[in-house]
């Protein structure tokens, strides 16, 4: 009975031991912010690591409309850019228009004489980058021919008409003399001339319009020469026409001369388009144009450019994020997340950063929890928090600066005869996208690794700073906590936090308390041993009592035990 009482008292004494319960000591733990549910990011060393906060770097959706600010966006409606340039009857509204971005719709249609442009993509790109359809008529002299040819396939209102920027020349009477016309460029800018050649559907149509059985058109400058011969023959009818017109273009530099020579089939220029160098462009899109502000436009609509990457569309205009294949890339903007444990062992003591993070910290990423004679408390450390935030805040802006394109990514178009070039261009573009996608993932992983290492380092700096302040007045308990061997009220804790703690003031008291406490203090390891020993002794005593009861009962005859062999 005495043994049992002693064991009970010993067990109660062990459980009642708490290193921080005395009025002459205190416990100070250092910790960091944590959240219940963090965000997974990728680093160089880990595919998935949880952090307290992260920012998405990939813009994956558009706003569904094209913003008309800060760029001048011109809605082509039913006209392509080339149709507007040639002077289609239903595109007259676009004469002399200016734009930063010309939007071509899928609803475009043709209502004039059927034509083709052998180098359509190049002409479209040149006109688009010029950003204007500013046209100047010139006094070409076409002697001995009939000008202003018209076609029933090209109606302006109810009347037969033709492309307003071109002059269709046919015979005059029974003659079509050889034409030789020159036009110098005395200006200080490039001139773009549009001209063409008519391909009749039959020999009869050829002689009916031009007298000669076969015409010829030669257009030359000091730098170039083009000679085109008509291809006479029937073709599938378009708007009642089996003939075709091929459109060509010539750029005349300042000081150069345009020379036109023809003996038939000439579709002559009426003047020139003034060439300008700029970053205007053209884009095919059916997204509506609205009043809003966005510096990046895609065929899907405008997108914000506050992220370094996007996977909305390869084709962009303006200051846009870099296109990559990934749907998501997250940049760590917080520290490694270690959710707080709700139960921290048998004694319920406060814990430091080695064990877990602290949820609910609102005044900093790093901080202190303490337990002293005045109770318990928590406070953030603003200096270490600000040091980490300052280094992290610039990461997103630096990534955006490295990746945002300050130019437009134009659409690539090639004719069928340039199929091999188109395949090569596609291969190059796909390779660039693959390379950028890899670089983006690597860049983000490196930045995330740096962020986590940085925040861990700031925690360690704060711990070392606190340890150097306390010196021999405290003992490192492990887990990010210190046992302070002197009375340390809230003012004392505050001096440790703000770096004004003077360990000399408390040195004698701490040394005295350390020697007194160590004489009777049982470490947690010894407590565990005592608990196990007491448990074993209790089990042994129970067995002894049970065996003694059985032997007593057998002697009294209350229990009979038969052993058979």
UniProtKB/Swiss-Prot annotation:
* Topological type in the membrane: Single-pass type I membrane protein
Q: Where are the transmembrane segments?
A: 530-550
Primary localization class, coarse = virion
GO CC term (a single one) = virion membrane
Xref: SUPFAM superfamilies: Influenza hemagglutinin (stalk) (SSF58064), Viral protein domain (SSF49818)
MF terms in GO: host cell surface receptor binding
Topological domains, Cytoplasmic: 551-565
Question: Per the UniProt entry, what are the Gene Ontology biological process annotations, in alphabetical order?
Answer: clathrin-dependent endocytosis of virus by host cell; fusion of virus membrane with host endosome membrane; fusion of virus membrane with host plasma membrane; viral budding from plasma membrane; virion attachment to host cell
Topology: which residues are Extracellular?
Answer: 17-529
Residues marked Cleavage (site):
344-345
The record ties this protein, via Pfam families, to: Hemagglutinin
- Spell out where lipidation (S-palmitoyl cysteine) occurs: 554, 561, 564
Q: PTM details?
A: Palmitoylated.
Please report any disulfide bonds recorded for this protein chain, giving both cysteine positions.
29-481, 67-292, 79-91, 112-154, 296-320, 488-492
Superkingdom to which the source organism belongs: Viruses
- Kindly state which keywords UniProt assigns to this record, in alphabetical order: Clathrin- and caveolin-independent endocytosis of virus by host, Clathrin-mediated endocytosis of virus by host, Disulfide bond, Fusion of virus membrane with host endosomal membrane, Fusion of virus membrane with host membrane, Glycoprotein, Hemagglutinin, Host cell membrane, Host membrane, Host-virus interaction, Lipoprotein, Membrane, Palmitate, Signal, Transmembrane, Transmembrane helix, Viral attachment to host cell, Viral envelope protein, Viral penetration into host cytoplasm, Virion, Virus endocytosis by host, Virus entry into host cell
Give me the glycosylation sites of this protein: 23, 37, 53, 78, 180, 300, 498
| InterPro entries, alphabetized | Capsid_hemagglutn, Hemagglutn_HA1_a/b_dom_sf, Hemagglutn_influenz_A, Hemagglutn_influenz_A/B
Compartment annotation: Virion membrane; Host apical cell membrane
Please give the function described in this protein's UniProt entry: Binds to sialic acid-containing receptors on the cell surface, bringing about the attachment of the virus particle to the cell. This attachment induces virion internalization of about two third of the virus particles through clathrin-dependent endocytosis and about one third through a clathrin- and caveolin-independent pathway. Plays a major role in the determination of host range restriction and virulence. Class I viral fusion protein.
Q: What else is known?
A: Major glycoprotein, comprises over 80% of the envelope proteins present in virus particle.
Q: Which family does it belong to?
A: Belongs to the influenza viruses hemagglutinin family.
Subunit and interaction comment? Homotrimer of disulfide-linked HA1-HA2.
Q: What is this protein called?
A: Hemagglutinin
Organism equals: Influenza A virus (strain A/Equine/Santiago/1/1985 H3N8)
